[in-house]
Amino acid sequence: MTYIFDLDKLNQTAKDCRENYSNAAPYPHVVIDNFLTEESARQVLENFPGSKDGIHWDQYGYEGYEIKIATSREEQFPALIKNALHDLNSGPFIRFLQELTGIEHLFADPHMLGGGLHLVGRDGLLGIHADFNWHPELQAHRRINLMIYFNDNWLPEYDGDLELWSTDAKTCVKSIEPVFNRAVIFSTTSDSFHGHPRPLKLPEGQWRRSIAMYYYTTQRPENELQNPHNTRYKGLHLE
């Protein structure tokens, strides 16, 4: 079976990057370029739905905290996009994530709560935040975030870098350009603060495109346990 990724390459990447992942600051993460095969990444870009393609997009317009559109309604997706998402929820891919992160017993979210396809346009942003930690339908702990970017000819002056912040939400520790076929994987906790907080300076009609997928376990380490909470924004839920 052909996947959108090169499985042998991914498995080697997991072995090579596992130590760097667990030791990364401000929290465990890795940035992987050329994540999907070149052909698959190009096909995803070509088939990535636009804002007016007849798909239901959820609108997020909370000024200063989140301005974007997103959808997880896979029944409306082009077949190629739907198949790509299924590959990212497949057994071989989850085994890669387990090897990379050291987190066992991961499973995918078929509902893609909060995930799926994301589009952010001119003046859009995503404030610095820590994600919700509990999936009420799966009754499971959120453990891993995966973002893959599909932004050809991206320029630094667009101001769309993903920022990873310190666990006290005081300082930006790392900035990551959302360039084409780059993946960012990180461990999700109640203090894994991140976002792209500056309004995008994109040309009118251009978008910051990404696929976001999240992975879960039924248990998590005791030192990470907190009561279930929704997304926590710096400046709204904490200073």
State where each predicted segment sits.
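Fe(II)/2-oxoglutarate
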Residues: M1-A25, N230-E239
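Non-heme Fe(II)/2-oxoglutarate
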Residues: F5, K9, R18-T101
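Histidine-centered active-site/metal-ligand motif
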Residues: H29, H129, H194-H196
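A structural signal for short, well-ordered beta-strand segments and their strand-loop junctions
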Residues: V31, F107-P110, G116, I185-F186, ...
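Non-heme Fe(II) oxygenase catalytic core, chiefly the N-lobe of the double-stranded beta-helix
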Residues: E46-S51, Q76, L80, L85-R142
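Catalytic core of Fe(II)/2-oxoglutarate
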Residues: N133-R142, N151-E239
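Eukaryotic charged/polar low-complexity linker/IDR segments
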Residues: N145-M147
